[in-house]
Regions:
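Low-complexity/repetitive intrinsically disordered segments
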Residues: 1-6, 162-163
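Short loop/turn segments immediately following the C-termini of beta-strands
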Residues: 11, 67, 123
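A short loop-to-beta-strand structural motif that recurs across blades of beta-propeller domains
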Residues: 14-18, 24, 70-74, 80, ...
Length: 163
């Protein structure tokens, strides 16, 4: 983050932790429950299930990929956790609609671009997806077939193997 802290997923304990610049370690999300509850409340009291990829957004918030909950969550700078993408059920769908209502399956990693959009690997759907600044989800690469990236094809018809 902007203070120089390092964040990491502690999947085994269902928590996300921060190492401060002084070396102190603190929990920033998850109460240890292997569950997915607590949206709208304190991130420290929420269940965080299978935390994986992490990113600090341009808003200073921490974004957490939850692989087995099939969603992406956000911890704002005040410590409140909320759902950013995924309806919590494994599946695929929702392009052109709100990301919080979309079906995603096994999200894995994410990154922000300079326009503040989120790109993430919808790994078990073999797709790369985007959440725009209005909260709308789009598929930008891949389709449901498993395979290898084929050079020279248009990005929306390429085949990926668990990106």
């Amino acid at each position: 983050d902007s203070a120089g802290s390092i964040y990491f997923s502690d999947s085994g304990s269902s928590k996300v932790r921060r190492i401060g610049v002084g070396g102190d370690i603190a929990v920033v999300a998850g109460n240890g429950d292997f569950a997915d509850h607590g949206d709208g409340g304190s991130a420290l009291e929420a269940g965080v299930r299978s935390p994986g990829g992490l990113a600090i957004g341009p808003d200073g918030a921490l974004y957490i990929v939850e692989q087995t909950s099939h969603r992406i969550r956000k911890v704002d700078t005040g410590g409140t956790i909320s759902r950013k993408a995924g309806n919590g059920m494994p599946g695929y769908g929702g392009d052109g609609g709100m990301a919080v209502e979309a079906g995603i399956k096994g999200p894995f990693r994410m990154v922000f671009d300079q326009q503040k959009n989120i790109y993430f690997s919808d790994r078990d759907n073999n797709r790369i997806r985007k959440i725009d600044t209005n909260g709308i989800i789009h598929t930008v690469a891949g389709h449901s077939n498993i395979g290898w990236v084929q050079d020279g094809l248009e990005v929306h018809i390429t085949v990926h193997n668990f990106p």
